[in-house]
Amino acid sequence: MSTPENMAWPAPAKLNLFLHVNGRRSDGYHELQTLFIFLDHCDWLRFHINNSDLVDIKPALADVPPEQNLIYRAAMLLKQYSTQPLGVMVELDKRLPMGGGIGGGSSDAATTLVALNYLWKINLPVDELAELGRQLGADVPVFVRGHAAFAEGVGEKLLPVEVTQKWYLVLVPECHVSTAEIFRHKDLKRDTPKQNWRELQQGNWHNDCEPLVKKNYPEVEKALRWLIEYAPSRMTGTGACVFAEFKHEHEAREVLALIPTWLRGFVARGENLSPLHVVLQQVYA
């Protein structure tokens, strides 16, 4: 294994196996219930530590100014915990789509927090690191904590859970869905009754954002219509990605082989423990 100073750190994708919207609070945020799992399909980040006091990212993401880049913002948040001139050049191998509902930006931010917490020797406990992550986005803490979780509230209440391991075919429609736009929309269904985790384990899962996204983004509706011919399918998060689950890898790959030219997709295994935390356990071993 590479030494921590030159190794690649994974930033895994996530799926929301369901997303139930229970209501909207007076502050505008939504009460949700959702189930997060990780996939073994990842962005990869290398962190080249220096004492320049600068945070540099290569290649720069097109159309994303540095101060809006979650990797940059995560590193700058962490720098506040040291008086040393900490610097880093982050090398990003971007494989997860942006605006896809599989957590690409949030996962990159979490991996930056976790890796630099170690490499910069800041050594914040995981609770503090997750709280920093929450400042960057509602999904960042689950990536920081690194275990499949049932989430409630505005996503801040996380119950670690074990989910039966399956294989997933994820399709990536050629569109970018704005999470903020979907949650602002007057037609979003916001009245799914809350259930406890024991009740939810019985199934009847759905995604309350899916009907609205299908209506406003024909590419998502078209992808779901194609995929549902082969297996029960749903959208993850606020989209645009959609997924179907399979018991065996070969079943998922057989459907992937049939994918039409207007679609992209990948097959990945569902994980209860984040690939990031598998690496972290090796680093601290």
From Swiss-Prot:
Pathway(s) the chain acts in = Isoprenoid biosynthesis; isopentenyl diphosphate biosynthesis via DXP pathway; isopentenyl diphosphate from 1-deoxy-D-xylulose 5-phosphate: step 3/6
Q: What class of enzyme is it?
A: transferase
Q: Which GO terms describe its molecular function?
A: 4-(cytidine 5'-diphospho)-2-C-methyl-D-erythritol kinase activity; ATP binding
Output one GO BP term.
isopentenyl diphosphate biosynthetic process, methylerythritol 4-phosphate pathway
Q: Which domain of life is it from?
A: Bacteria
Recorded hits in InterPro entries, A to Z, give:
GHMP_kinase_C_dom (IPR013750), GHMP_kinase_C_sf (IPR036554), GHMP_kinase_N_dom (IPR006204), IspE (IPR004424), Ribosomal_Su5_D2-typ_SF (IPR020568), Ribsml_uS5_D2-typ_fold_subgr (IPR014721)
Bilayer-spanning residue ranges = none
Q: What EC number(s) does its UniProt record assign? A: 2.7.1.148
Would the keyword Plastid be found if you checked this record's keyword annotation?
no
Pfam families reported for this sequence:
GHMP_kinases_C (PF08544), GHMP_kinases_N (PF00288)
Active-site residue list: 14, 139
Reactions it catalyzes: 4-CDP-2-C-methyl-D-erythritol + ATP = 4-CDP-2-C-methyl-D-erythritol 2-phosphate + ADP + H(+)
Swiss-Prot/TrEMBL keywords = ATP-binding, Isoprene biosynthesis, Kinase, Nucleotide-binding, Transferase
State if ATP-binding is listed as a keyword: yes
Q: What exactly does this protein do?
A: Catalyzes the phosphorylation of the position 2 hydroxy group of 4-diphosphocytidyl-2C-methyl-D-erythritol.
- What PANTHER family is this protein classified in? 4-DIPHOSPHOCYTIDYL-2-C-METHYL-D-ERYTHRITOL KINASE, CHLOROPLASTIC
* Family of the protein in this entry: Belongs to the GHMP kinase family. IspE subfamily.
This chain's protein is named 4-diphosphocytidyl-2-C-methyl-D-erythritol kinase
